[in-house]
Amino acid sequence: LILKEKEYKDLPFVDVVEGDWFYDAVQYARINGFFNGTSETTFAPNGTMTRGMFVTVLGRIAGVDTADYAGQTPFKDVPANMYYAPYVAWAAKHGVTSGMGDGTFSPDGLINREQMATFFVRYFEKFDIDYSTGENITTTPADINKVSSWAQDAVKNLWKQGLLDGIKTDVYAIHDNFAAPTAACDLYDFLSLSPEKIADYLPFL
């Protein structure tokens, strides 16, 4: 997987215009094939992401060969014929996800910010990706006590590196659903924080 940084072209989306805070990130995500819009001409910047969509994005970043996971269904609610199925199988195999704890993955469930943080950290750590930025933020989100126990370390680790922005000052709004523009911006931040680090690990498989 070669990350493209310079091949910027006008976006085809009528609902994303230059000057939008997420414009560059959406452009970056699109030219690298991480995700597309909701149609050929719309991105739906007010839209949210499902868990299936998000794991698909991670799998595309990793350069997953979907043929290697065809027909694998590690969770009872992930049909083998769905677009996200091979990516979910990849994520389960490599410990990026363990599902909901009841044999399901909830692929159509909206992903919230604490789930996003956990996916990212597991993804980085399972493949030994150095996601340090040189930052050493000593504060924690004011709402850290609202974070689920299984997500606490991931949120703290990303926050410490300056890779998580609060909705308000020092508030991460951890249970808010993860919006598509935010996903694009976080991917942009994570994958451009240190290209020389990322390049050594993509693709993994």
Model-identified regions with their sequence ranges:
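Acidic helix/loop microenvironments that form the catalytic cleft of cell-wall polysaccharide enzymes
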Residues: F178-T182
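Feature responds to low-complexity, polar/acidic, surface-exposed segments characteristic
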Residues: L1-Y23, I31, N36-G52, G59-A85, ...
